[in-house]
């Protein structure tokens, strides 16, 4: 792993470090230790295993548990694009495109500690992070099993809020039936996610049945 970049979704700045930095791994470890959830694109199979391998070899313990939101999994399960690559998806959604790819000479330059090559590498990395965040917000209404943001609040929540983005602005739109009962269904005005209320408005009674085989 030559470098990494990351940002918080509610802040502007992008963190980045390269292999030669003294806190190359400890800074990343601290960020993951603080994170409730990590958004990435194919990170479950690629980025995170590489990062964990670096941590292990450096003698670092696992950071505190965090949820993973892999946008590639959402793209594959919910849509059918000609290509599932971040560059294609971001352009298809009108967000923008990745920085022009790194050439073999650029990679060799980084290995040889060439300043110009490193600058290009970090710029490429930061652009990927910026695109990933924008794609995340575009895909947000479609993401299944998104972590409940209300569970990570420091204060007590005394109002019903959207479990995905925490907004208090939503509207009731019909009911939803589950195996245990019927609940009010809501649509968030901010992230446009669907969710259900906590209280049952009707209970389903299931009778015991027997059958002969």
Go through each PLM region and give its residues.
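Short metal-binding segments enriched for Cys and/or His
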Residues: 189-213
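Short linker/helix segments within small regulatory modules
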Residues: 175-185
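Short cysteine-rich clusters marking metal-coordination/redox-active sites
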Residues: 162-165, 188-191
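Acidic, Mg2+-coordinating catalytic module of metal-dependent nucleases/exonucleases
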Residues: 39, 88-155
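Conserved DEDDh/DEDDy metal-dependent 3′-5′ exonuclease domain
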Residues: 10-92
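Short, non-ligating residues that shape and space the ligands of small metal-coordination modules
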Residues: 168-174, 197-198
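Residues immediately within or flanking Cys/His clusters that coordinate Zn2+
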Residues: 157-160, 185
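RNase H-like nuclease fold core
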Residues: 1-12
